[in-house]
Amino acid sequence: PQTNQPQQEQQQDDGQQPETQQEQEEQSQQQTVTAPSLSQQLKEAKAKNDDIIGWLKIDDLKVDGAVVQAENNTKYERLNEWGQYSWTGTYFADYECNFDSRESLSKNTVIYGHNVDFNDNRDGERFSQLLYFADEEFAKQHPYVYFTIDGDDKSSEMVWEIFSVFYTTTDFDYIRINKDYRNPQEGEITDAQLMNIIKGAQERSEYDYEVEVSGEDKILTLSTCSYKY
């Protein structure tokens, strides 16, 4: 799944009632989604492994654990979040992504996880669980992904709204983070490049989420293998 930029938690109102019916209807359409508090789990995990940079959670799935980042994308392919051998690996962020703060997050934050079942068993480990989103009812009932990074305030606890769920072949460069793979020093992708990723994801999406996303946003991409093709 791909999700658009993290939602800000809405402030509480002053307790006054709306003056018009229109204001009441507009207020009822607003939805406040509060990120679960994952900071303590993250803090305890990071004390055991400094490569841990975040905590990822999706309601009603086994996706609820630490996310690591190394100097390359191969170190944790067969290691768990504690650095111990594991066939299913762990959730790991692309080495090019930035997690210094919420404000400095990459325009496209990419997190990988294995699907090691050749039959695409959605009850498997790690990102095998993402296959639950192939079920439209489940997908519609679970529109959010929660991702928390290390930080000193609540802004590090983020809610991301899903705008696309798709299968793709490798000709779609949806995991691009920098302008140029060969010259990462040129910086991250432009708004136009991000918009191309967004449009490509929406065109391939299994469902129409009707979520507005622009090239000025930041997105979170969860990526795994599938044996569908």
Segment roles from a protein language model:
Residues 1-229:
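Solvent-exposed, non-transmembrane regions of membrane-associated and secreted proteins
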